[in-house]
């Protein structure tokens, strides 16, 4: 394979803005006052917030295709790459568990799933798959997983219910979490990063690998943009059609959800590539590049600093609520005040990210 892409600045920017968006929606000034687009869907449906996690898995897939194609072209031993993949996956997973233990380090209530553990699993499976299969095989595997998940979820009755259920808390994926998931679960009896839903989440990474293969092809830049947009459009359209029988749902990562969000990610990558790498647009993209240079570190920093802003009590009230009350005292509507705080929090996280970027400190797990 010819590697015509040396460095996709557009991918760095997309990664950074995705992380910034993740921090923005995770840390509002007041969780009771949040604009609907900045909230996850309660169950079925899709909000802009629902797109963030699959975007990051998609970006992981693109990065795998670019990074490991270069290493294969250099003739590096696969055995060495396997070791590094396993070690990196373990590190990302371990950091995720560490964040789950904060602030009390209560091992009896440990949560074994979450954003970083899922990223670790998707990275591990996708990277090993990429080193040992061609893109067509990867596409077939991804499609097979989605079809199998669809059939399992829509044909196998939930034990104890006597019929197929796709509702919250009583579907097969949630039942499996309740029966077999160790430790604490995010929703008490089930987890949005649960056991069964992890399989289709791997396909979000596979879709990114396929996009990465496209970016590495000998096609012209213009043709790459066209293909990204066309593929993305048809994936999104097909996903919503699939959603008529298997609803678009982030909580159980339905097959239709994978298609819709992967399609949007294809189009987003095409837009970023056109604007940044083709047209050289730098205005407004630099913050994304800075965030993207240390994406996981920035994510971890957001969680750790939250202990201060959400945990430290001054006068019986947390710092975030002091900011929220100050903004509302200025006449802001509660939801606007909550969003302004979230933007301010992203800006605070940006400061150490900028310092690391300027000093060329890039922390790679």
Task: Give the predicted meaning of each segment.
Residues 1-365:
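Alpha-helical transmembrane segments and their immediate juxtamembrane cytosolic regions
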């Amino acid at each position: 394979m010819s590697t015509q892409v040396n460095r996709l600045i557009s991918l760095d920017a997309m990664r950074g803005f995705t992380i910034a968006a993740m921090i923005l929606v995770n840390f509002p000034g007041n969780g009771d006052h949040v604009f609907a687009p900045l909230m996850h869907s309660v169950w079925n449906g899709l909000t802009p917030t629902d797109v963030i996690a699959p975007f990051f898995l998609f970006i992981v897939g693109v990065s795998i295709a670019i990074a490991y194609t270069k290493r294969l072209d250099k003739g590096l031993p696969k055995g060495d790459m396997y070791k590094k993949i396993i070690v990196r996956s373990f590190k990302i997973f371990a950091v995720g568990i560490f964040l789950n233990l904060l602030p009390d380090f209560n091992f009896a209530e440990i949560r074994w799933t979450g954003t970083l553990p899922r990223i670790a699993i998707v990275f591990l499976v996708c990277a090993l798959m990429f080193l040992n299969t061609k893109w067509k095989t990867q596409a077939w595997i991804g499609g097979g997983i989605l079809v199998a998940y669809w059939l399992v979820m829509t044909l196998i009755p939930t034990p104890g219910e006597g019929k197929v259920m796709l509702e919250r808390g009583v579907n097969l994926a949630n039942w499996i979490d309740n029966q077999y998931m160790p430790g604490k679960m995010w929703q008490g009896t089930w987890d949005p990063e649960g056991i069964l839903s992890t399989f289709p989440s791997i396909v979000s990474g596979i879709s990114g690998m396929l996009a990465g293969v496209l970016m590495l092809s000998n096609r012209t830049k213009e043709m790459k943009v066209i293909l990204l947009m066309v593929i993305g459009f048809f994936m999104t359209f097909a996903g919503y059609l699939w959603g008529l029988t298997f609803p678009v749902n982030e909580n159980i990562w339905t097959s239709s959800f994978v298609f819709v969000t992967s399609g949007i990610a294809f189009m987003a990558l095409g837009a970023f590539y056109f604007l940044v790498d083709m047209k050289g647009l730098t205005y407004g993209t630099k913050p994304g590049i800075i965030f993207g240079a240390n994406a996981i570190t920035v994510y971890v920093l957001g969680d750790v600093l939250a202990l201060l802003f959400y945990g430290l009590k001054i006068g019986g009230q947390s710092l975030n609520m002091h900011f929220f009350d100050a903004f509302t005292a200025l006449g802001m509507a509660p939801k606007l005040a909550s969003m302004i705080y979230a933007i301010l929090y992203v800006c605070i996280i940006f400061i150490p990210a900028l310092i690391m970027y300027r000093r060329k400190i890039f922390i790679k797990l």
